[in-house]
Regions:
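Basic, glycine/lysine-rich polyanion-binding surfaces/domains
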Residues: 1-171
Length: 171
């Protein structure tokens, strides 16, 4: 979700089981996102609430997807059993390993590789997170303008340093 100036305000993944849509996001954003989504309810019957105490997100075994999954949305009462089941077919890793996988795949995380001025055009997420041909959304004017100009003011890139000591050129 963008702010009115086109800056990325919220980043989340959706999980839809056919009757309920869950948004998974980093800690600390739920309260303000719930307030925003509640204000955006117009004609549809939608209940917005924090289900953090009821569900957990686990990285499931398997090849990484374009969002870093597969992920499993698991009722908290079943987390220990699910972790044991996953552990039978995969090696448990910490969050640093998952972050390394995310960075290697070029998936920025809000407030980690971005700042309060970041726009989707700079982050390489236009094709997967922003639709350029339909709808009306906050920040659309900024995103469309930068897209049409073809040159974002900044661009997030991966820089790989091999550790070599190159030294400075002779003067």
């Amino acid at each position: 979700i963008l702010d009115p100036q086109g800056h990325v305000e919220y980043q989340f993944n959706l999980v839809d089981d056919g009757s309920t849509t869950f948004l998974t996001l980093d800690p600390g954003y739920a309260e303000t996102l719930i307030a925003y989504l509640t204000k955006m309810k117009f004609m549809l019957k939608v209940d917005v609430r924090d289900a953090t105490s009821e569900f957990a997100v686990l990285r499931a075994p398997g090849a990484a997807t374009d969002i870093g999954g597969p992920y499993a949305l698991v009722p908290r009462a079943e987390v220990a059993q699910m972790a044991q089941t996953f552990g039978a077919v995969a090696t448990q890793v910490g969050t640093w390993a998952l972050d390394a996988e995310r960075v290697a795949a070029g998936r920025p995380r809000i407030a980690f590789e971005t700042d309060h001025k970041s726009i989707p055009n700079e982050l390489g997420v236009l094709n997967g997170a922003v639709h350029m041909n339909k709808g009306c959304y906050r920040g659309q004017e900024t995103v469309a303008k930068i897209f049409n100009l073809g040159n974002p003011p900044r661009r997030l890139v991966m820089l790989h340093l091999d550790g070599s000591d190159v030294g400075f050129p002779a003067t």
